[in-house]
Amino acid sequence: MNIDYVRSILPHRYPFLLVDGVIEESEDRIVAFKNISISDPVFQGHFPEYPIYPGVLIIEGLAQTAGILLLKDLEGIPLFLGIDEARFKKEVRPGDKLIYEVKKIGEKLGTVQVEGVAKVENTIVAKAKLLLGVKKK
């Protein structure tokens, strides 16, 4: 599923839409991707001589991927409520294709906990547990 599908679900827009497409999706799991381009404005400052995609944006990409999973059956604004066990394993550079794998691991009192893993060429570059909610419009 391409960017049109992503835009039909998420409220985010360029330059803060950090998911380019969805590879597969089920009720409790989703795999999405982001192509990392040197033309991304973030590389003007992070870091011009040796561009590295910021870890915080990788985590946001995982959260947006989780948002697609949550919002496909709901309407509202996705809320990023918390993060645990975040780890960054390897740098991400322009030309890389980030793969976001997110699965639901729990639901309680209107919140959903997910486990997210970001990979480049099947190597884990980051992972975290995220807590999300949906604010009704």
From Swiss-Prot:
Keywords noted in UniProt: Cytoplasm, Lipid A biosynthesis, Lipid biosynthesis, Lipid metabolism, Lyase
Listed EC numbers: 4.2.1.59
Pfam family, one: FabA
GO biological process: fatty acid biosynthetic process; lipid A biosynthetic process
Compartments where found: Cytoplasm
Family statement drawn from the similarity comment of this UniProt entry: Belongs to the thioester dehydratase family. FabZ subfamily.
Protein name (database record): 3-hydroxyacyl-[acyl-carrier-protein] dehydratase FabZ
